[in-house]
Regions:
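Short, flexible loop segments at the rims of nucleotide/cofactor-binding pockets, characterized by
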Residues: 3-4, 32-34
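Histidine-acidic metal/acid-base catalytic patches
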Residues: 9-28, 34-144
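Surface-exposed cleft-lining segments at the edges of enzyme active sites
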Residues: 1-4, 79-80
Length: 144
């Protein structure tokens, strides 16, 4: 979490590795990835075994982040549906696929006051359609 003591994959992997437990694993999320200023590039994952990444959450982000002092507020109130922000989600999912990660779960984590304010039905449909579009582009096999 970019606003925490474990701000990026490098530190997260160091914690998991130091734990030396079979069930210690990582979850990846494009909001956290982008806000940690990590490039969407396999080089970031090169030292991490694919089986140590258990799950991914997908969403998208605004181009301009909240101020560092309130970045957590963006995380808790202003995430975007996959493919509707800076457009990082499809490339993020492609990177996961290319690494050979086989997530036990692919979750959608769109935490957005603005989207929810349009009603639960709108939020569900908007998030579903956005997610489906990204997965059809980046990793259609997971939809089968």
């Amino acid at each position: 979490m970019p606003y925490s003591g474990i701000p990026d994959m490098k530190k997260g992997w160091a914690v998991v590795k130091a734990a030396d437990c079979e069930n210690a694993k990582l979850i990846m999320d494009p909001w956290h990835w982008v806000r940690a200023n990590q490039p969407i590039d396999l080089s970031v994952l090169e030292d991490i075994p694919a089986d140590k990444i258990v799950s991914i959450q997908i969403n998208d982000v605004w181009e301009r982040p909240y101020a560092t002092t309130i970045l957590r507020d963006e995380s808790m109130h202003d995430r975007l549906a996959p493919g509707t922000g800076i457009g990082c989600t499809a490339d993020f999912v492609k990177m996961v696929k290319e690494k050979g990660i086989k997530p036990n779960a692919i979750g959608v984590e769109v935490i957005s006051d603005a989207i929810l304010a349009k009603g639960l039905e709108y939020a569900a449909n908007h998030t579903y359609e956005s997610t489906k579009k990204v997965l059809e582009e980046a990793w259609p096999e997971v939809l089968r």
